[in-house]
A protein has these predicted regions:
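N-terminal lobe of the biotin/lipoate ligase/transferase fold
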Residues: 2-162
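Catalytic palm active-site di-aspartate
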Residues: 167-179
Length: 179
Protein backbone atom coordinates (compact mmCIF):
# COMPACT_ATOMS: atom_id res chain seq x y z
CA UNK A 1 0.00 0.00 0.00
CA UNK A 2 1.34 3.42 -0.96
CA UNK A 3 2.24 5.88 1.80
CA UNK A 4 0.14 9.05 1.53
CA UNK A 5 1.35 10.60 4.79
CA UNK A 6 3.04 13.64 3.20
CA UNK A 7 0.21 14.62 0.80
CA UNK A 8 -2.35 14.18 3.59
CA UNK A 9 -0.25 16.28 5.98
CA UNK A 10 0.01 18.98 3.31
CA UNK A 11 -3.77 18.95 2.91
CA UNK A 12 -4.29 19.35 6.66
CA UNK A 13 -1.86 22.30 6.71
CA UNK A 14 -3.34 23.96 3.62
CA UNK A 15 -6.94 23.35 4.77
CA UNK A 16 -7.00 26.83 6.37
CA UNK A 17 -6.71 28.44 2.88
CA UNK A 18 -3.85 30.66 4.09
CA UNK A 19 -0.59 30.91 2.17
CA UNK A 20 2.23 28.64 3.33
CA UNK A 21 5.67 29.02 1.78
CA UNK A 22 7.46 26.05 0.29
CA UNK A 23 10.29 26.73 2.72
CA UNK A 24 7.97 26.61 5.75
CA UNK A 25 6.29 23.45 4.51
CA UNK A 26 9.67 21.86 3.81
CA UNK A 27 10.94 22.66 7.31
CA UNK A 28 7.77 21.34 8.89
CA UNK A 29 7.87 18.09 6.89
CA UNK A 30 11.66 17.70 6.84
CA UNK A 31 12.16 17.90 3.09
CA UNK A 32 13.24 20.25 0.32
CA UNK A 33 11.00 22.76 -1.45
CA UNK A 34 11.40 20.66 -4.61
CA UNK A 35 10.04 17.62 -2.75
CA UNK A 36 7.14 19.73 -1.45
CA UNK A 37 6.38 20.80 -5.03
CA UNK A 38 6.28 17.13 -6.08
CA UNK A 39 3.72 16.38 -3.35
CA UNK A 40 1.71 19.47 -4.30
CA UNK A 41 1.42 17.88 -7.76
CA UNK A 42 -0.08 14.78 -6.10
CA UNK A 43 -2.73 17.03 -4.55
CA UNK A 44 -3.50 18.46 -7.96
CA UNK A 45 -3.74 14.94 -9.39
CA UNK A 46 -6.32 14.23 -6.68
CA UNK A 47 -8.41 17.16 -7.95
CA UNK A 48 -7.39 19.73 -5.35
CA UNK A 49 -6.99 23.26 -6.71
CA UNK A 50 -3.74 24.52 -5.17
CA UNK A 51 -2.71 28.12 -5.84
CA UNK A 52 1.00 28.76 -6.26
CA UNK A 53 2.07 32.40 -5.86
CA UNK A 54 5.79 33.22 -6.11
CA UNK A 55 7.01 34.84 -2.90
CA UNK A 56 3.90 33.76 -0.97
CA UNK A 57 3.69 30.00 -1.34
CA UNK A 58 0.81 27.58 -1.67
CA UNK A 59 -2.84 28.01 -0.75
CA UNK A 60 -6.22 26.45 -1.33
CA UNK A 61 -8.91 28.72 -2.80
CA UNK A 62 -11.08 28.27 0.29
CA UNK A 63 -10.86 26.43 3.61
CA UNK A 64 -11.85 22.77 3.61
CA UNK A 65 -13.24 20.72 6.45
CA UNK A 66 -11.85 17.21 6.48
CA UNK A 67 -13.84 14.18 7.59
CA UNK A 68 -13.73 13.48 11.33
CA UNK A 69 -14.12 9.75 12.02
CA UNK A 70 -15.02 10.22 15.70
CA UNK A 71 -17.69 12.81 14.94
CA UNK A 72 -19.18 10.66 12.17
CA UNK A 73 -19.13 7.53 14.38
CA UNK A 74 -21.14 9.36 17.06
CA UNK A 75 -23.92 9.87 14.50
CA UNK A 76 -24.14 6.22 13.40
CA UNK A 77 -26.68 4.27 15.47
CA UNK A 78 -26.18 0.86 13.88
CA UNK A 79 -22.90 -0.49 12.56
CA UNK A 80 -19.37 0.81 12.48
CA UNK A 81 -17.78 3.56 10.45
CA UNK A 82 -14.41 3.50 8.72
CA UNK A 83 -13.07 6.82 7.42
CA UNK A 84 -10.19 6.57 4.97
CA UNK A 85 -8.63 9.62 3.34
CA UNK A 86 -7.58 7.77 0.17
CA UNK A 87 -9.05 4.51 -1.11
CA UNK A 88 -9.56 2.72 -4.39
CA UNK A 89 -13.33 2.44 -3.87
CA UNK A 90 -15.56 2.52 -0.78
CA UNK A 91 -17.72 -0.17 -2.37
CA UNK A 92 -14.73 -2.42 -3.07
CA UNK A 93 -13.51 -1.90 0.50
CA UNK A 94 -16.77 -3.34 1.82
CA UNK A 95 -16.90 -6.10 -0.81
CA UNK A 96 -13.44 -7.25 0.28
CA UNK A 97 -14.70 -7.58 3.87
CA UNK A 98 -18.16 -9.13 3.41
CA UNK A 99 -17.51 -11.89 5.93
CA UNK A 100 -16.61 -9.38 8.65
CA UNK A 101 -19.40 -6.84 8.15
CA UNK A 102 -22.48 -6.09 10.22
CA UNK A 103 -25.60 -4.40 8.86
CA UNK A 104 -25.03 -0.66 9.01
CA UNK A 105 -21.25 -0.73 8.57
CA UNK A 106 -20.11 2.30 6.57
CA UNK A 107 -16.96 3.20 4.65
CA UNK A 108 -16.41 6.92 3.95
CA UNK A 109 -13.52 8.45 1.99
CA UNK A 110 -12.14 11.86 1.09
CA UNK A 111 -10.87 10.57 -2.26
CA UNK A 112 -11.48 7.47 -4.38
CA UNK A 113 -8.87 6.48 -6.93
CA UNK A 114 -11.14 4.00 -8.69
CA UNK A 115 -14.70 4.97 -7.78
CA UNK A 116 -17.31 3.01 -9.69
CA UNK A 117 -20.95 3.53 -10.45
CA UNK A 118 -23.60 1.41 -12.06
CA UNK A 119 -22.33 -1.26 -14.42
CA UNK A 120 -18.80 -0.71 -13.14
CA UNK A 121 -18.42 2.71 -14.79
CA UNK A 122 -15.50 4.65 -13.30
CA UNK A 123 -15.65 8.31 -12.40
CA UNK A 124 -13.28 10.93 -11.05
CA UNK A 125 -13.74 11.55 -7.33
CA UNK A 126 -11.86 14.75 -6.39
CA UNK A 127 -10.44 14.91 -2.86
CA UNK A 128 -12.67 16.56 -0.28
CA UNK A 129 -15.20 17.74 -2.85
CA UNK A 130 -18.00 15.23 -2.36
CA UNK A 131 -19.18 12.60 0.06
CA UNK A 132 -17.97 9.17 -1.04
CA UNK A 133 -19.54 6.43 1.03
CA UNK A 134 -20.83 2.91 0.91
CA UNK A 135 -23.01 1.20 3.51
CA UNK A 136 -23.51 -2.51 3.99
CA UNK A 137 -27.00 -3.67 4.89
CA UNK A 138 -28.07 -7.30 5.11
CA UNK A 139 -31.52 -7.72 3.55
CA UNK A 140 -33.35 -10.63 5.15
CA UNK A 141 -35.65 -10.90 2.09
CA UNK A 142 -32.70 -11.34 -0.28
CA UNK A 143 -31.47 -9.25 -3.24
CA UNK A 144 -34.96 -8.80 -4.73
CA UNK A 145 -35.79 -6.54 -1.78
CA UNK A 146 -33.19 -4.04 -3.02
CA UNK A 147 -35.02 -3.19 -6.27
CA UNK A 148 -35.61 0.55 -6.19
CA UNK A 149 -33.82 0.95 -2.86
CA UNK A 150 -31.03 3.06 -4.35
CA UNK A 151 -33.49 5.60 -5.74
CA UNK A 152 -35.49 5.73 -2.49
CA UNK A 153 -32.33 6.33 -0.46
CA UNK A 154 -31.26 9.11 -2.84
CA UNK A 155 -34.66 10.80 -2.50
CA UNK A 156 -34.67 10.52 1.31
CA UNK A 157 -31.15 11.96 1.59
CA UNK A 158 -32.13 14.82 -0.76
CA UNK A 159 -35.17 15.57 1.42
CA UNK A 160 -33.03 15.59 4.58
CA UNK A 161 -30.51 17.95 2.96
CA UNK A 162 -33.36 20.22 1.80
CA UNK A 163 -34.74 20.32 5.35
CA UNK A 164 -31.26 21.44 6.49
CA UNK A 165 -31.27 24.35 4.03
CA UNK A 166 -29.78 22.86 0.85
CA UNK A 167 -32.72 24.05 -1.26
CA UNK A 168 -31.10 23.32 -4.61
CA UNK A 169 -30.25 19.64 -3.99
CA UNK A 170 -31.45 17.38 -6.80
CA UNK A 171 -31.43 13.63 -7.39
CA UNK A 172 -29.89 12.29 -10.60
CA UNK A 173 -30.99 8.77 -11.45
CA UNK A 174 -30.57 6.56 -9.61
CA UNK A 175 -28.85 7.98 -6.52
CA UNK A 176 -26.45 10.81 -7.31
CA UNK A 177 -27.17 14.06 -5.49
CA UNK A 178 -26.26 17.48 -6.87
CA UNK A 179 -26.23 20.83 -5.07
Amino acid sequence: MKDYTVPLTLISILADAEFHSGEQLGERLGMSRAAINKHIQTLRDWGIDVFTVPGKGYSLPEPIQLLDEEQIARQIEHGRVTVLPVIDSTNQYLMDRLGELQSGDVCVAEYQQAGRGRRGRKWFSPFGSNLYLSMYWRLEQGPAAAIGLSLVIGIVIAEVLQSLGADKVRVKWPNDLYL
